[in-house]
Amino acid sequence: MEQLLHYIWKHKIFPLQELKTTTGQKVEIIDTGLANTNAGPDFFNAKVKLNGILWIGNVEIHERSSDWLKHGHHTDATYDSVILHITSDADIDVHRTNGEPIPQLILTCPDYVCRSEERRVG
């Protein structure tokens, strides 16, 4: 599922209007960033407006937001540059190493994409 979320994010396969963080901040995606195939955040140099303010930084994607803790990102300064955490299940709030909260956006798999993936995987 996490790889599917990467695909959905990279190709903007989600409604581009009325996106909001889990805390109600309005989200406008300007640029999803460059996919990272190495260690570190999943996408570099994304451009996102949160409540009209432009943020440029990295994006991390997990199936569940609690994976942030499981992967140790809360203690890894490499992830302090994350400006938006993408998840399909926001089961916890996530924070930088200094305790500052990171905005989270819930993305779900559009039906037509999920059906296609189910057929592909078999």
Predicted features along the sequence, with ranges:
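N-terminal ordered "arm"
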Residues: 7-66, 73-74, 79
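An acidic- and aromatic-residue-enriched active-site/binding cleft used to recognize and process polar
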Residues: 62-66, 89, 110
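Short, surface-exposed linear segments at secondary-structure transitions and domain or protein termini
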Residues: 65-71, 112-116
